[in-house]
Amino acid sequence: MRRLNRKNNEALKKLNDRQRKVLYCIVREYIENKKPVSSQRVLEVSNIEFSSATIRNDMKKLEYLGYIYQPHTSAGRIPTDKGLRFYYEEMLKISKETSEADLAVETFKSVPLADPEKILFLAGNLLARLTQGYVLIERPNTRDLKILRVMLIPVSEDYLIFSILTEFGVSRVTPIKTQERLNWEEIERQLNFLLRGRTIGEVLMGKIESLKGSGFLRLIESLIGETVERYLDAGLENLLKDETLTLEDIRNLLEEVKDQKFLESLVGEGITVRIGREIGRKNLEKFAVFSGRYFKGESPIGSVYFFTSKVTRYDRNHKIFEYILNRLSEYFTSTSRR
């Protein structure tokens, strides 16, 4: 990724301010209207005070440098992946230089603090709706969660409920049939003494000697072994409505995101954006993907991705994505400190 940025920066040094404005205008117009952009159109929608011939010469240079291309003779120009990357980088600069625009986004205030699944569901649907993209959110790994409390609740002479409550409000519950009359309150107290503050992973790895081989360890293993989808998704219908994508494009995407290693390869430091060929899969060259992590304190606990057509509003989408990641990190950090 750094090599790509270095090459782009070297190419940008060959452009003067006017040519950068022309390129910016072409990309913005194409994103808005999804039609090739002519030199005349550049003059109509910009404040560039030069002749159409000058703009055409600039467009030839931009084409030579790989920022735009002409689909056929006498047509306007269309941005390449490199041109879209330029637009995205320019948007980042503008965002840093100006005060952040107010985003019409909902907050998480109405969602109970003890319901992380609802928080992730809300975040995914909000991100999909505002970006018109397809969203994948990785759930926190259950094995990394700290145990807050264990409960043994008798419900009849023969049955009791075994419950584990972890940070973020994630709980696992199972009924137990028992024929023994034991002091369940004392057993619950001892279990809490042993388990509270430990991660589920530590327990399952046998780090608590007194639990090794016990029925309770087997119960915990069976509870955590319950199948939970690693990712929740939202917004597939947005891609189906996008006129720049075909059903085949969408099928290709759905097939590729099944590959866990592929998804992990998309994540870098901070927010990473890959456009077209930068994704590294030929059958995904019509897409752009934004990826990033959300945190508990300083520790990353999950990744978020959203895929959209590469002809998209990079400026707005970057702000929205950053907002969602920050809110998720705030939520999981504050919940873990309760």
From Swiss-Prot:
SUPFAM superfamilies: GAF domain-like, Winged helix' DNA-binding domain. InterPro entries: GAF-like_dom_sf (IPR029016), HrcA (IPR002571), HrcA_C (IPR021153), WH-like_DNA-bd_sf (IPR036388), WH_DNA-bd_sf (IPR036390), WHTH_transcript_rep_HrcA_IDD (IPR023120). The keyword Signal does not apply. GO terms for molecular function: DNA binding. One of its GO terms (biological process) is negative regulation of DNA-templated transcription. Keywords: Repressor, Stress response, Transcription, Transcription regulation. Negative regulator of class I heat shock genes (grpE-dnaK-dnaJ and groELS operons). Prevents heat-shock induction of these operons. Belongs to the HrcA family. HAMAP family: HrcA (MF_00081). This is Heat-inducible transcription repressor HrcA. It comes from Thermotoga sp. (strain RQ2).
